[in-house]
Amino acid sequence: MAQAQIDEQRRLQDLYVQLKKEINDGEGVAWLFQQKTYTDKDNKPTKATPPLRTTSSDLRDYWTKLECHNCHEEYWQLTTYYCKECRKCEHGKLRHTKKECEQCACKAAQETSA
């Protein structure tokens, strides 16, 4: 029993060290824990504050400010489903949604109809 507790404690320490390394390197899930608040002159958060602030320039550009159709309140939404390596389709076009580019969709339609 004591050996199992020691093994578990060692495993948790290793995970903690790995998490600290990812945060220091700015990789992995570290960007989720970093947020910058924009404030007005009364030091209150403004609507310009996105839900999360990323340290990664690749991810930062894909936050889009949208407006609610019902109450017209503005909110931020992440507009990409892909990492830096997978963002481009085989035709070299950037994709921010799950939809394919026109060439990819046309090719897929031809393959399914054949």
From Swiss-Prot:
Keywords: Host nucleus. GO terms for biological process: viral DNA genome replication. The keyword Ribonucleoprotein does not apply. InterPro entries: ADV_NS1-3. It comes from the Viruses. It is found in: Host nucleus. GO terms for cellular component: viral replication complex. Plays a role in viral DNA replication. This is Non-structural protein NS2. The lineage of its organism: Viruses, Monodnaviria, Shotokuvirae, Cossaviricota, Quintoviricetes.
